[in-house]
Amino acid sequence: MLSAAMEYLRSCWGPASSPAGRPRKGSDAAGRQDGLLWYKDAGQLVAGEFSMAVVQANNLLEDHSQVESGPLSTTDPNLQGTLVGVYDGHGGPETARYINDHLFNHLRGFASEHKCMSADVIRKAFRATEEGFFSVVSSQWSMRPQLAAVGSCCLVGVICAGNLYIANLGDSRAVLGRLVKGTGEVLAMQLSAEHNASFEEVRRELQAAHPDDPHIVVLKHNVWRVKGIIQITRSIGDVYLKKPEFNREPLHSKFRLQETFRRPLLSSEPAIVVHQLQTTDQFIIFASDGLWEHISNQEAVDLVQHNPRNGIARRLVKAAMQQAAKKREMRYSDLKKIDRGVRRHFHDDITVVVVFFDSNAITTANWSRPSVSLRGGGVTLPANSLAPFSVPT
């Protein structure tokens, strides 16, 4: 029983750890670890390059992420492309890890069935992932009722046949860097919609969907929340706010609502944008809200534009942490010494993936490049054993 429990805990951290649970410093193919930072400074994709980094703040890393590049179909080798996923969990890592394990396989299955990539394929992959996690919660309800209160934001980008598909639940963000030919500037263009009750239009959407509930959104401690509980209005998981049969005992009382509900309080329907890539589209930044809490869209784009590609995701993480330290009137070097768990009081888990577009391969993928299947994160250090992490100069 103990060994099974240890295996479960180990799986929460992802594949970037060694079998013995020691941090992996080498192996560029699988990424590197340095203290609470995991990073992959550079890699090749079907139609471009990427840089990826994750820094942990929570005691258990709740951000999960992946980059998949190569065949997007199980039956058609000519359907090539890239998927980037950023899954910002809340209440625990289980939902984010489940998405990491299942969404891409669902997407490949539906792409094979439809013989193409489309918004409908992505929507079906989201729905199948949501339904699969519901099944897990239902099967473990009597033993692990707390799974009903775990959820995750879900940001997915798919690059295929000259199109960029952005699908989102929650408040992670995808920001495009687009060149302005006349001036040479690179401007930020946010492609993802955010689902957070802090936005008035999101609150109006909720109120319109629940006209019989005057308390669907509540201002609590100066923060707007759905039923006074959660800021996110769309997610995978959070079954206790979507199905009333899971908002009762044996779920802990702090998650249970006093009144029942007839319709799901949160949605799992992704907002999807289809963007036809242009030669002026330089790169796109995918990141959890841990980055955007500290850096604006344009600041992030400027940083990417004016620095080397190699290690740029790490550089963005550093910039966010520097701002977090500044807000608390402390030195960045001191913030790096704070261990996971306590670190969450200063900043959230942060995941960043930057994809650079190869303009020559936007419409014709470079199939000679090897397939990529990479997951971010994987820090498995014992408490109080940090080593400083480095940032490219």
Curated annotation (Swiss-Prot):
It comes from the Eukaryota. Mn(2+) 2 binds at residues 88, 289, 348. It is a single-pass membrane protein. PROSITE patterns: PPM_1, PPM_2. Its cofactor is Mg(2+); Mn(2+). GO terms for biological process: regulation of intracellular signal transduction. Gene3D superfamilies: PPM-type phosphatase domain. Its main location: membrane. Keywords: Hydrolase, Magnesium, Manganese, Membrane, Metal-binding, Protein phosphatase, Transmembrane, Transmembrane helix. It holds the Pfam family PP2C. Its EC number is 3.1.3.16. Binds 2 magnesium or manganese ions per subunit. Residues 49-357 form the PPM-type phosphatase domain. Mn(2+) 1 binds at residues 88-89. GO terms for cellular component: membrane. CDD domains: PP2Cc. It catalyses: O-phospho-L-seryl-[protein] + H2O = L-seryl-[protein] + phosphate; O-phospho-L-threonyl-[protein] + H2O = L-threonyl-[protein] + phosphate. One of its GO terms (molecular function) is metal ion binding. The chain crosses the membrane at residues 147-167. Belongs to the PP2C family. This is Probable protein phosphatase 2C 72. It comes from Oryza sativa subsp. japonica (Rice). The lineage of its organism: Eukaryota, Viridiplantae, Streptophyta, Embryophyta, Tracheophyta.
